[in-house]
A protein has these predicted regions:
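N-terminal secretory signal peptides that target proteins for export/translocation
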Residues: 1-5
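Noncatalytic, solvent-exposed loop/strand surfaces
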Residues: 21-179
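Bacterial N-terminal signal peptides
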Residues: 8-19
Length: 179
């Protein structure tokens, strides 16, 4: 299964459920608003090329991060296959139009990443109008959800991922927790 197909499949799923989830509650972090993978929304459980799909948008890159949604926008962590461009993509939930593709980090010597992983596996989260995205030792960033402006970046997390980044950041009070 090719990378582009997997991304389209993932986007197709998100698109099919985005309307229901967005109306019930924002799916703003890994495993949803409470971090438990549950929602009150009743998304479709079946879809095809034409059934229960509102739109499809190709997103080039290789990323295993889950999409998150808040305030009518879907946010995706993304990376090139070689890990030399790490970005945050914003898609309009209603139309599927890519609103922003924000380059956050451009490592010249990316750390090793196992071929079955990606450089963009951690899921971002959205809170209080800010999007937080973590790429492991390559960097962590905070972006303004309304403008796409990069509010801050950090590249000082010393860690050896062994197989590539995979730890999604979580908010706790006024802290950002990364592992």
């Amino acid at each position: 299964m090719g990378t582009r197909f997997r991304i389209l499949l993932g986007m197709g799923f998100v698109i099919a459920v985005a309307g229901g989830v967005a109306r019930a509650e924002a799916w703003n972090q890994f495993r949803g608003p409470a971090g438990d993978g549950r929602t009150q929304a009743r998304p479709p459980v079946e879809w095809s090329e034409a059934r229960n799909v509102v739109w499809k948008t190709p997103i080039p890159g290789k990323a295993w991060a889950s999409p998150v949604e808040a305030e009518g926008r879907i946010w995706l962590a993304n990376a090139t296959e070689d890990g030399r461009r790490l970005s945050l993509v914003c898609v309009a939930a209603a139309t599927g139009r890519v609103e922003r593709d924000i380059t956050l980090f451009e490592p010249t010597k990316p750390a090793f990443c196992y071929p079955y992983n990606s450089y963009a596996s951690p899921t971002p989260f959205v809170v209080d109008g800010r999007v937080f995205v973590h790429f492991g030792s390559a960097g962590t960033a905070c972006v303004a959800a309304d403008t796409g402006a990069v509010l801050w970046t950090r590249q000082d997390l010393p860690c050896d991922h062994h197989r590539g980044p995979g730890s999604s950041p979580i908010p706790f009070e006024d802290l950002l927790i990364v592992n």
